[in-house]
């Protein structure tokens, strides 16, 4: 199980490294489709690892992710993921151990917890999605 999770984390990091910002209702990821990254491929994209999508080893909630203003994500270990008006995302997910919510900067925003304390915030300014570099924090 640990090896499988490690492999998924490597895939997620590769995915983040190749993500391309786009405008409007197109992809914000090479592995996502739909408005602001609705997960469709193996739970990766902007769901899967941390919230939404299929999750890791089926721990997420299939069919849910972030499109439009966003939808509730995954429930993991009894911690429920919730979306509030596209601005604040209190949630529980794999690897996100910081504050219980994330404020968007200048519009829509949604963090992606990918395990082991690695957090990759994605911030939307206007209609342009701008993935930021992953931040490795001791949290």
UniProtKB/Swiss-Prot annotation:
Disulfide bonds: none annotated. Sequence repeats lie at residues 42-46, 47-51, 52-56, 57-61, 62-66, 67-71, 92-96, 106-110. Residues 1-19 form the signal peptide. The keyword Secreted applies. InterPro entries: Lamprin. Its main location: secreted. The keyword Flavoprotein does not apply. It is found in: Secreted, Extracellular space, Extracellular matrix. It comes from the Eukaryota. GO terms for cellular component: extracellular matrix; extracellular region. Residues 42-110 are annotated as: 8 X 5 AA approximate repeats. Keywords: Extracellular matrix, Repeat, Secreted, Signal. One of its GO terms (molecular function) is structural molecule activity. The polymeric lamprin chains self-aggregate to form fibers and have secondary structures particularly rich in beta-sheets and in beta-turns. Self-aggregating protein that is part of the soluble form of lamprin. This is Lamprin 0.9. It comes from Petromyzon marinus.
